[in-house]
């Protein structure tokens, strides 16, 4: 890929300006999200821990989606607040986000400091791969959060923060048990 891949789609200076503006808007959104996340993780470190996958992440993910797709051998796991598939996606997003930020900084520095061509070429290639990976991740995120029928009941909770009790019992049994036990301890 690299820079040549994207340049092949641009034939006029107006198209180049549009491409740079789109990149600027995307970079601003990406950086806002990155710094928002960093601030959130610093202010509430426990939230970061609940996003990390556990040792059963792969088998839990396979069972979760196997049960959703109706495979009889798949047993629905005791998911907590976040599914293990979401926790694995979290690690992927952190890795790709760090890759894009690091390579973006290298690509920006090249305008101030004379860097070797192979460094800039490698940074460009990795930045482009990260971009494609993040776009595919975004599409998968929208697909699994909004488009598949099994998410339709839980999607509104991502907006208003509330979920019907029966849905919480079904979709997030481990989290539901934690909440009930905390409520019983408080009584």
Model-predicted segments: where are they?
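Membrane-embedded alpha-helical bundles that constitute the cytochrome b-like, heme-associated redox core
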Residues: 1-187
